[in-house]
Amino acid sequence: MAAVTQLGYVGLGVSNVEEWEHFATDILGLESNGVDEDGNLSLRMDEYSHRFIVQPNGKDDVEFVGWQVTDEPALREIVEQLRQAGIEVTDGTEDEIKSRRVEGMIRFDDPEGTRTEIFYGPPISFDRPFNSPRAVGFVTAEQGLGHVVLYVEDLDRTVKFYRDVLGMKISDFIRNLAFFHCNPRHHSLALIEAKSPKKLNHFMLQTQNMNDVGATYDMVLDGAMPLTRGPVSYTHLTLPTKA
């Protein structure tokens, strides 16, 4: 069975791209690639040419989630798994492949209607090292972007999809939450069963050290952004190593 290997990129639909660029660069420490001719902003956090694509459509929600696979055979195997599960799959257009800067991709909606993309040939910029405007570093590599947490109305159905069709493994269950991993990161995806007008609960970026977290927290306390939740310590960010 083919399986996704990491959270590759996230697309966001927003009301104000300029404010998002300020938030992403000045607060989070991501690097901006600027805005393209369609008004889309792309953002970097490592050697990939982008990890976020921000689109000016006013939704203020997740627009799509991109999962990486190892190669084209793995992508084609996942296509068959999706079709056997009754999911309508579409190959990425030339414009979409160019926009994502990947070698190949497919797209479909998950059982909750979240647009999902799977790609191979990651968008790496070998000639341009990541340059954070805040000198922040992020933990990515085989662990991917970080994690994304989505609201769902039918947890059982959606768990079966990500586990049995996309090959993710369950890390934990906590009441109405399910956590999935596809690499050493404890979870790259979490699902919350709850009614919500939005699909996105949050995304997580892991910095390379606690100092970066503290400096960002200080900026927020100084009024850079509204604080919705204070510091919290995760029990573990990666899966326990087997003895």
Language model regions located:
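Internal, well-ordered alpha/beta segment that forms a basic, Gly-enriched binding/recognition surface
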Residues: 100-123
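Short, structured motif recognition centered on aromatic/hydrophobic residues
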Residues: 7, 30, 43, 52-54, ...
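Asp-box/WD-like beta-propeller blade repeats and closely related beta-sheet repeat scaffolds
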Residues: 92-99, 132-135
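Vicinal oxygen chelate
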Residues: 6-15, 57-83, 104-110, 144-153, ...
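Core segments of cupin and vicinal oxygen chelate
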Residues: 2, 8-50, 96, 150-188, ...
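Surface-exposed beta-loop interaction hotspot
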Residues: 126-153
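Conserved small/polar residues in nucleotide/adenosyl-binding loops
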Residues: 235-241
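Intrinsic, low-complexity N-terminal interaction/targeting segments
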Residues: 52, 114, 126, 136, ...
